[in-house]
Amino acid sequence: MIKSFKHKGLKLLFEKGVTSGVPAQDVDRINDRLQAIDTATEIGELNRQIYKLHPLKGDREGYWSITVRANWRITFQFINGDAYILNYEDYH
């Protein structure tokens, strides 16, 4: 279950369906990924080829990343079946 957001646009999309805070061409993909994250009870459930799930390293250790489009990712921490600090970013 999603517990917290860093990115205000993701939060508005997830909680209220407001699309103005994310790129219009990515709304469907972002919604798909948010729903998958929200229903996942373990990180392995997000290990779909299309998501390219992977753990981050270095100063981002403890965070996971899934692909939305090109370099854009949803990053988050996954602790005891819950997702925290969801962000939409290009960290490359």
From Swiss-Prot:
GO terms for molecular function: mRNA binding; ribosome binding; RNA endonuclease activity; translation repressor activity. Pfam families: HigB-like_toxin. The gene is higB. Coiled coil: none annotated. Changing H92Q: Loss of toxicity and mRNA cleavage, but still binds to ribosomes. Its EC number is 3.1.-.-. SUPFAM superfamilies: RelE-like. The keyword Amino-acid biosynthesis does not apply. The active site is at H92. The record marks F14, N31 as: Interaction with HigA. GO terms for biological process: negative regulation of cell growth; negative regulation of cell population proliferation; negative regulation of translation; plasmid maintenance; RNA catabolic process. Toxic component of a type II toxin-antitoxin (TA) system. A ribosome-associated translation-dependent mRNA interferase. Inhibits translation by sequence-specific cleavage of mRNA. Prefers either in-frame or out-of-frame 5'-AAA-3' codons (lysine). Also cleaves the first three AAAs of stretches of four or more A sequences. 20% of codons containing AA are cleaved and occassionally cuts even at a single A. This is Endoribonuclease HigB. The lineage of its organism: Bacteria, Pseudomonadati, Pseudomonadota, Gammaproteobacteria, Enterobacterales. InterPro entries: HigB-1, RelE/ParE_toxin_dom_sf. Keywords: Endonuclease, Hydrolase, Nuclease, Plasmid, RNA-binding, Toxin-antitoxin system. Forms a complex with the antitoxin HigA which inhibits the mRNA interferase activity. The heterodimer dimerizes to form a HigB-(HigA)2-HigB tetramer that is able to bind to the DNA.
